Amino acid sequence: MKDTKLVKLTGTSADKNVLEEAGRLIRQGELVIFPTETVYGIGANGLDAVACRAIYTAKGRPSDNPLILTVPDKAGVEAVVSYLPPLAETLIEKFWPGPLTLVLPRKDTVPDAATGGLDTVALRCPDHAGCREFLKAAGVPIAGPSAAAEAFHDMEGRVAMILDGGSCTVGVESTIVEVLDNVVTVLRPGAVTEEMLAEVAPYVTTDTHLVTGKGVPKAPGMKYRHYAPEAPVRVFVGSADQVSKAVGEVRTAAENDGKRLGYLLSREVIEKSEVTGKDVYCWGTHGNKTELAKELYRGLLFFDEHPVDLIVAEGVETGGIGTAVMNRMKKAADGDVTTV
């Protein structure tokens, strides 16, 4: 067990010494949890195979699931890719710093442990000033798969330091795209939508298949679920009236079976369904995709702390960031999503 140092960032010059210490720990092969605008990351030196493997151990992550390397700027990309397509440069200029990850051909200096053995590497520059200062202090690309801020206590003893930067502004992981010639393929939806990508890319397509068996995914989220609570999840999408009716039907059946339900719902559906008590988590206003994106993982993890037999959740329509939200909800629910 490690002695984990927890530090709250202030967003001021007072953070400088802490960020330099965190960067030094990364260079020494240690793990550091750090904030971004999307979700928190479990960071390690992305050029150190041993450190990257330590991430898999700490998180219990399959080693064939590629890691995303975070860099402070475009120069950080050029240091680890063998070729930077012109279209990728355009995407960097348009969307960085921001929630867009690019999958590009890698140099041999990037270890297989960071790429799942693929000949490509996933790269991102976060839109978070403290994070970028941390990256500069480290002086190396930082491999940083997602970590839930609400589950910091689970990582104590596994990492050297936790940089607590408060709530993330986006709430779901970055969009991941592969760039080949003039084609951008979305491997994982996120806050940078297909519509936004189409404004600068000649052709945009989506790879929706899930990798199974011994296949190696090109990006995180293509083979394994992101966050999922211990309890099964059932998701309903529709008007507040329709969802509240569906919630009522599930509640009646659960009461007859003696099951305890958890409710992850909008304010309007909670009121219409008349559900109360400690097993209710309100994620925001009905239909507000941005609010659900920010609260989704916090809400799912809430029910690990308040165990239930089944979580009844309310989703949103796809489109915009709603596509990313429903991608995560569908995986958390193992596909149990119903439009009512």
Question: Model-found features: residue ranges?
Answer:
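Active-site-adjacent structural elements in enzyme catalytic cores
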Residues: 1-340
